[in-house]
């Protein structure tokens, strides 16, 4: 079994577990990002308050809205990403060794090369899995109709604040697929792909930071006669790497969520986005810079925890798989 396949499967497994543990936070964060309160008069709910409100008004199950396609998307995304990451990484390492033989470089993959490797893998992943995340975003932001919400809204702003989906229950995966297709055709499944492609810099930064810190840690251990990195150390390295990447690219994530969520159908043009640039300009004009950082504290907690768990489990799965393969080969 190739290293690329081992890393792909391990990444998928780690991603699923991380997703299960942090999904309620992800749902709350997506809802926070897609709030369209232009006047900003209301006090914003904290993460725990928002979560309790969802449970009280809509039930526990809404915290896990879109979980099934999300798990499929996580497995696909992590599998595709890690597979192509390892493929491109192997080529980069081979190129570095070839350059060393010619007297150029020390044979190691530099920071810039690591960034390119992660960017290429991320771009392939985005183009292949974007339709899944459009569906997940729709399901996370869909809200159950209450008796008060079934009446006609008093104003466009109240409709926008609620972001109430008009489809009847149940609102499952196939309902969502039909809604997206009816609204924008096949291209609707690639809404938000431009900011998402730009956001490739997030995992690129994440893996660049992670690989750099991991390499330095291993070198320090090698000087002491050991090359082992503990699960806790991997957890902490993953958390630090994700924190740096998330803070840098968060505004693009908000734009992506706005584009992928169900568009407000009122006559208020301020809340209807024609594309990425239109969304950015309207958010700047009507919400200010604040609009680009809605729910950021929730996202930091969710993404850092998920990334730390993912890295820890992925590395342990890779170690276990290689150990099993080596034992099978020796026997």
Curated annotation (Swiss-Prot):
Solcar repeats lie at residues 2-91, 109-216, 229-320. It comes from the Eukaryota. InterPro entries: Mitochondrial_sb/sol_carrier (IPR018108), Mt_carrier_dom_sf (IPR023395), SLC25A32-like (IPR044712). GO terms for molecular function: antiporter activity. Inhibited by pyridoxal 5'-phosphate, bathophenanthroline, tannic acid, mersalyl, mercuric chloride and bromocresol purple. Gene3D superfamilies: Mitochondrial carrier domain (1.50.40.10). One of its GO terms (biological process) is NAD transport. Expressed in cotyledons, hypocotyls, vascular tissues, trichomes, hydathodes, seeds, pedicels, flowers and stigma. GO terms for cellular component: glyoxysomal membrane; peroxisome; plant-type vacuole. The chain crosses the membrane at residues 5-25, 63-85, 116-136, 180-200, 235-255, 293-313. The keyword Nucleotide-binding does not apply. Disruption phenotype: No germination or growth inhibition, but delayed storage oil mobilization. Decreased sensitivity to 4-(2,4-dichlorophenoxy)butanoic acid (2,4-DB), a precursor converted in vivo by beta-oxidation into the herbicide 2,4-dichlorophenoxyacetic acid (2,4-D). Enlarged peroxisomes. It holds the Pfam family Mito_carr. Its main location: membrane. It is a multi-pass membrane protein. Mediates the NAD(+) import into peroxisomes. Favors the NAD(+)(in)/AMP(out) antiport exchange, but is also able to catalyze a low unidirectional transport that might be essential under special conditions. Transports CoA, dephospho-CoA, acetyl-CoA, adenosine 3',5'-diphosphate (PAP), NAD(+), AMP, ADP and NADH, but has no activity with ATP, GTP, GDP, NADPH, NADP(+) or FAD. Required for peroxisomes proliferation. Belongs to the mitochondrial carrier (TC 2.A.29) family. This is Peroxisomal nicotinamide adenine dinucleotide carrier. It comes from Arabidopsis thaliana (Mouse-ear cress).
């Amino acid at each position: 079994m190739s290293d690329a396949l081992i890393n792909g499967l391990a990444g998928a497994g780690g991603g699923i577990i991380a997703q299960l543990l942090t999904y309620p936070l992800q749902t709350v964060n997506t809802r926070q990002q897609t709030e369209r309160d232009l006047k900003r008069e209301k006090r914003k709910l904290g993460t725990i308050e928002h979560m309790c409100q969802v449970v009280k008004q809509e039930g526990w199950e809404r915290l896990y809205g879109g979980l099934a396609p999300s798990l499929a998307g996580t497995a696909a995304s992590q599998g595709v990403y890690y597979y192509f990451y390892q493929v491109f990484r192997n080529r980069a390492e081979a190129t570095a060794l070839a350059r060393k033989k010619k007297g150029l470089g020390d044979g190691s993959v530099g920071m810039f090369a690591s960034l390119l490797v992660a960017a290429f893998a991320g771009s392939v992943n985005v183009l292949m899995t974007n339709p899944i995340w459009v569906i997940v975003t729709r399901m996370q932001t869909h809200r159950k109709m209450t008796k008060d919400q079934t009446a006609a809204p008093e104003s466009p702003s109240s409709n926008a604040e609620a972001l109430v989906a008009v489809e009847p229950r149940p609102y499952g995966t196939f309902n969502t697929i039909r809604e997206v297709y009816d609204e924008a055709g096949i291209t609707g499944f690639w809404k938000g792909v431009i900011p998402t492609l730009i956001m490739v810099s997030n995992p690129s930064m994440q893996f660049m930071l992670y690989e750099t810190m991991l390499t330095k840690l291993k070198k320090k251990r090698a000087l002491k006669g050991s090359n082992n990195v503990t699960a806790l150390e991997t957890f902490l390295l993953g958390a630090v790497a994700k924190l740096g990447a998330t803070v840098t690219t968060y505004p693009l994530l908000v734009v992506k969520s706005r584009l992928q969520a169900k568009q407000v159908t009122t006559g208020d043009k301020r809340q209807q986005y024609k594309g990425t640039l239109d969304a950015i300009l309207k958010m700047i004009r009507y919400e200010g810079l604040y609009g680009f950082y809605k729910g950021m504290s929730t996202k930091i907690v969710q993404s850092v925890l998920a990334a730390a768990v993912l890295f820890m489990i992925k590395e342990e799965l890779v170690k276990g798989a290689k150990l099993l393969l080596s034992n099978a080969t020796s026997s």
